[in-house]
């Protein structure tokens, strides 16, 4: 196959290798799905010797096909039948429906295994459309009923998004979109580690992202608009998160472990190299962590990367989505049990971002008297308290009761955010730095 995958993949939003220099992008496994459709596992090699594997579904055509934009056009390749054009098949409605039919049939194609969940009904005739919201994966929405998420960068092991959604669906938890199906392969041929490739879930039609709702409330609060309070929704969100935690604990169990002091210290040291602003606070943060050395905490399976962008408000309730865990971590690490307080801390940090992101866009003289900063702080405090109260109403235990542990998880998250902002969005660095100072007191 002479297709220049490397020239195309580096411009995709889901490509994770931008910080490294690409050497080659070559197909490792090619599985024909039909005459004009190939499933491809692409190995991308970098100058540092590392290799990442990406998943593509390629639609072949002898001449240009209307409807495919530049982003969906991979290139041309010379084969036995002459020159052909390759397209990203997820943008082709007929090809997307073919994938859904394979899931519906629980089909096996070579080493590709498709599975429909028991009792699931898939909308085989609904019109498909690629979602514009994804970053690391590609999702195709079928009408108002289902969403096919295709993982782009794939790794061996059990995928936590499929795993936890299956557990929650089987338990009947109403705070997740029901898992309808999935597909996988073997990493290095039959008998080797499994490798998740994608999943189908019920689509949350007419839903709103929690981040959009919270930031809209915060903007209205700054403008003195009546009705800007978000606390009732924060309370219900706390209910939902506690419900998911309770289901996971009951289904998969809990255990007791020491607070992960070494893990958070390693993250602090790494972050300090990216954000010099942390240097003057590193000793105080470390001291906070070391206070918890040897402290026993209850751990279980959790979401692992929870924030307001990972929750959807439907007309009926809150849903938690994307149980993949912390981006960039190996699958085994993402599946490691952790304290439910990590998820709680993620939501609390997200409240701070929702309130303060407007402030960082203002010139200092626009809030010279600190009035807007006070409003932001009050908004965060009110919504954080409502969320924790809602969580406690379902869990029977207020997460603020273990305040020093919760604060440590908030610090860990803020330290990570500081490193990220210093590298990619320096104008937002004051948000996590302000939080670190507040937590340290």
Curated annotation (Swiss-Prot):
<keyword id="KW-0067">ATP-binding</keyword>
<comment type="pathway">
    <text>Glycan biosynthesis; glycogen biosynthesis.</text>
</comment>
<comment type="subunit">
    <text>Monomer.</text>
</comment>
<keyword id="KW-0321">Glycogen metabolism</keyword>
<keyword id="KW-0320">Glycogen biosynthesis</keyword>
<comment type="similarity">
    <text>Belongs to the aminoglycoside phosphotransferase family.</text>
</comment>
<dbReference type="GO" id="GO:0005978">
    <property type="term" value="P:glycogen biosynthetic process"/>
</dbReference>
<dbReference type="InterPro" id="IPR011009">
    <property type="entry name" value="Kinase-like_dom_sf"/>
</dbReference>
<keyword id="KW-0418">Kinase</keyword>
<protein>
    <recommendedName>
        <fullName>Maltokinase</fullName>
        <ecNumber>2.7.1.175</ecNumber>
    </recommendedName>
</protein>
<keyword id="KW-0119">Carbohydrate metabolism</keyword>
<dbReference type="GO" id="GO:0005524">
    <property type="term" value="F:ATP binding"/>
</dbReference>
<dbReference type="Pfam" id="PF18085">
    <property type="entry name" value="Mak_N_cap"/>
</dbReference>
<keyword id="KW-0808">Transferase</keyword>
<dbReference type="GO" id="GO:0005992">
    <property type="term" value="P:trehalose biosynthetic process"/>
</dbReference>
<dbReference type="InterPro" id="IPR040999">
    <property type="entry name" value="Mak_N_cap"/>
</dbReference>
<dbReference type="GO" id="GO:0046835">
    <property type="term" value="P:carbohydrate phosphorylation"/>
</dbReference>
<dbReference type="GO" id="GO:0016301">
    <property type="term" value="F:kinase activity"/>
</dbReference>
<keyword id="KW-0547">Nucleotide-binding</keyword>
<comment type="function">
    <text>Catalyzes the ATP-dependent phosphorylation of maltose to maltose 1-phosphate. Is involved in a branched alpha-glucan biosynthetic pathway from trehalose, together with TreS, GlgE and GlgB.</text>
</comment>
């Amino acid at each position: 196959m002479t297709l220049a995958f490397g020239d195309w993949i580096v411009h995709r939003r889901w490509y994770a290798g931008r910080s490294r220099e690409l050497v080659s992008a070559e197909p490792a496994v090619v599985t024909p799905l039909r005459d004009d459709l190939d499933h491809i596992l692409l190995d991308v090699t970098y100058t540092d010797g590392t290799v990442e594997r990406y998943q593509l579904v390629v639609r072949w055509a002898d001449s240009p096909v209307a409807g495919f934009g530049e982003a969906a056009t991979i290139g041309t390749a010379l084969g036995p039948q002459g020159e052909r054009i390759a397209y990203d098949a997820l943008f082709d409605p007929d090809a997307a429906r073919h994938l859904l039919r394979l899931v519906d049939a629980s089909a096996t194609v070579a080493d590709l295994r498709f599975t429909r969940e028991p009792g699931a009904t898939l909308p085989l005739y609904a019109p498909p459309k690629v979602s514009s919201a994804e970053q690391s994966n590609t999702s195709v929405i079928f009408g108002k009923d289902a969403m096919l998420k295709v993982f782009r960068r794939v790794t061996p092991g059990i995928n936590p998004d499929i795993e936890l959604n299956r557990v929650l669906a089987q338990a009947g938890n109403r705070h997740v979109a029901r898992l309808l199906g999935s597909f996988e392969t073997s990493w290095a041929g039959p008998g080797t580690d499994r490798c998740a490739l994608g999943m189908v879930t019920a689509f949350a039609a007419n839903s709103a992202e929690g981040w959009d709702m919270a930031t809209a409330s915060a903007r209205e609060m700054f403008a003195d608009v009546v009705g800007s309070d978000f606390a009732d929704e924060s309370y219900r969100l706390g209910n939902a998160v506690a419900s998911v935690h309770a289901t996971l604990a009951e289904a998969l169990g809990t255990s007791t472990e020491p607070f992960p002091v070494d893990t958070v210290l390693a993250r602090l040291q790494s972050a300090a190299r990216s954000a010099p602003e942390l240097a003057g606070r590193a000793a105080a943060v470390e001291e906070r962590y070391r206070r918890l050395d040897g402290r026993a905490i209850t751990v279980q399976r959790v979401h692992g990367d929870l924030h307001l962008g990972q929750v959807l408000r439907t007309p009926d309730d809150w849903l938690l989505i994307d149980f993949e865990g912390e981006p960039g971590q190996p699958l085994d690490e993402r599946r490691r049990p952790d304290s439910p307080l990590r998820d709680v801390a993620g939501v609390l940090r997200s409240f701070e971002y929702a309130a303060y992101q407007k402030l960082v866009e203002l010139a200092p003289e626009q809030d010279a008297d600190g009035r807007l900063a006070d409003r932001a702080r009050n908004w965060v405090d009110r919504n954080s308290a409502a969320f924790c109260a809602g969580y406690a109403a379902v869990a029977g235990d207020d997460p603020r009761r273990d305040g020093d542990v919760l604060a440590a998880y908030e610090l860990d998250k803020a330290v990570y955010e500081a490193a990220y902002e210093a590298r990619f969005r320096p104008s937002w660095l004051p948000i996590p730095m302000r939080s670190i100072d507040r937590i340290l007191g």
